[in-house]
Curated annotation (Swiss-Prot):
Family, as annotated: Belongs to the ATPase alpha/beta chains family.
Source organism, top-level taxon: Bacteria
Main EC class the enzyme belongs to: translocase
Protein name (Swiss-Prot/TrEMBL): ATP synthase subunit beta
Function: Produces ATP from ADP in the presence of a proton gradient across the membrane. The catalytic sites are hosted primarily by the beta subunits.
Chief location bin: membrane
Length: 483
């Protein structure tokens, strides 16, 4: 934080007046001896259509001449020059502790599903906090098993790590992160925190219902800054959720799951705020402090000695361009990246994870074992060879390939089908129950395909199945139908 705690308290209760309103940006004049510190929360009351409401701002700039520039966290309709503004003397604070579980909050920590008096918080923590010191950090290489074949085999997740789900519009990011909540939170048995950054109301409602049905809502806190809210709200909502997660990690010594959907909208909100503050834009119109803003968030999402925050973050890729500064800045902070492919999604193969571009820090024999590693490498080699042969196939046809290449293409097609899997979240669309496959069964299944043990089975038998038992059942049905 820029200011010390002493400086924050010194200006508590100071009164200023609004000098200018430009949309969500407000300039406020304070006495010379009571200028609010950066990040201080300011409040004012307005009456609109017969209703009185409190508007909260966050101090963002000192302009000189006793003026501060603040960003509103609510709509500024009805706000006029000369309105009195109070300095709280402290940053925005949110409730933390067991009392937040099972409830939905906004960026200010106000519950959206119950009255505020019903929340029994252990404490209120400011959302702007320092990242843990280097001495307190602890690295982790333990695998987090999800039961999804393509992820466990090719891009294994790390307990206490940061995981990114990258993809363009409509390729299944939100469905996959909801699937992770259903699977990991249910099997994890600990505390989860969900940050909806620029979330659609429909998606938020779907998530609430699914978590209730899965029985994980009672151990989860949800914090939403919806798509129709001001950019200041969308910029800070991830910090509000992270603060709740940090309390569970640091005070209650718990392992915490933190889900963020969507990091791109966090970046987008930062860009909007930067423009409103009059900063000169940087590459592709993004804010000049993009890397700094991302670092302030990501450096706090970490594991400390004895307890961890495991983070799963959905990241929208504008126009499927991975060189865009927003996704590119996020890459450096992640331990595992799962890239969703539009081309794979167009073939109806879900989850549409690209097996060749997705990565993991622990895809190494010393962490996951030789069998797992060797199978993952063989699968990638077959898929890469198949990709290289596609131009020849498109021009000359499969018949012009050598016998060896024909076998590679045949096995690659079976692998591609076997990487697809029914999910619990998608049951409402497909009518088919989801499946969970252990890492042992996953490795055995793909090893069998690579070794040619399943060359006699038609490739359609591998589509949207769990383990090899499902493949055998499908193959038996296909044979029965063709008799």
């Amino acid at each position: 934080m820029t200011a010390t705690a002493t400086e924050h308290v010194a200006t508590a209760g100071a009164t200023g007046r609004i000098a200018r309103v430009i949309g969500p940006v407000v300039d406020v004049e304070f006495p010379a001896d009571a200028i609010p510190s950066i990040y201080n929360a300011l409040t004012t009351e307005i009456t609109l259509n017969g209703q009185t409401k409190t508007i909260t701002f966050e101090t963002s700039q000192h302009l000189g001449d006793n003026l501060v520039r603040a960003i509103s966290l609510q709509a500024t309709d009805g706000l006029v020059r000369g309105t009195t503004v109070q300095d709280s003397g402290a940053p925005i604070s949110v409730p933390v502790g067991d009392g937040v579980k099972g409830h939905i909050f906004n960026v200010l920590g106000k519950p959206l599903d119950v009255e505020e008096s019903e929340i029994k918080a252990d404490a209120y923590w400011p959302i702007h906090r320092k990242a843990p010191s280097f001495a307190s950090l602890e690295g982790s290489t333990e695998m987090l098993e999800t039961g999804i074949k393509v992820i466990d085999l090719l891009t294994p997740y790390i307990k206490g790590g940061k995981i990114g789900l990258f993809g363009g519009a409509g390729v299944g990011k939100t469905v996959l992160i909801q699937e992770m909540i259903t699977r990991v939170a249910r099997n994890f048995g600990g505390t989860s925190v969900f940050a909806g950054v620029g979330e659609r109301t429909r998606e938020g409602n779907d998530l609430w219902v699914e978590m209730e049905e899965a029985g994980v809502l009672k151990d989860t806190a949800l914090v939403f800054g919806q798509m129709d809210e001001p950019p200041g709200t969308r910029l800070r909502v991830a910090l509000s959720a992270l603060t709740m997660a940090e309390y569970f990690r640091d005070v209650q010594n718990q392992d915490v799951l933190l889900f963020i959907d969507n990091i791109f909208r966090f970046t987008q909100a930062g860009s909007e705020v930067s423009t409103l503050l009059g900063r000169m834009p940087s590459a592709v119109g993004y804010q000049p402090n993009l890397a700094d803003e991302m670092g302030l968030l990501q450096e706090r999402i970490t594991s400390t000695k004895g307890h961890s925050i495991t983070s799963m973050q959905a990241i929208y890729v504008p126009a499927d361009d991975y060189t865009d500064p927003a996704p590119a800045t996020t890459f450096a902070h992640l331990d595992a990246t799962t890239e969703l492919s539009r081309e794979i999604a167009s073939r109806g193969l879900y989850p549409a994870v690209d097996p060749l571009t997705s990565t993991s820090r622990i895809l190494d024999p010393q962490y996951i074992g030789k069998d797992h590693y060797n199978t993952a490498v063989r699968v990638k080699q077959i898929l890469q060879k198949n990709k290289e042969l596609q131009d020849i196939i498109a021009i000359l046809g499969v018949d012009e390939l050598s016998e060896e290449d024909k076998i590679v293409v045949s096995r690659a097609r079976r692998i591609q089908q076997f990487l697809s899997q029914n999910t619990y979240t998608a049951k409402q669309f497909t009518g088919v129950e989801g499946s969970t496959v252990s890492i042992k069964d996953t490795v055995e299944g793909f090893t069998a395909i690579c070794d040619g043990e399943l060359d006699h089975i038609a490739e359609q038998a591998f589509f949207n199945v769990g383990g090899l038992d499902d493949v055998e059942r499908n193959w038996a049905k296909i044979q029965e139908q063709t008799k």
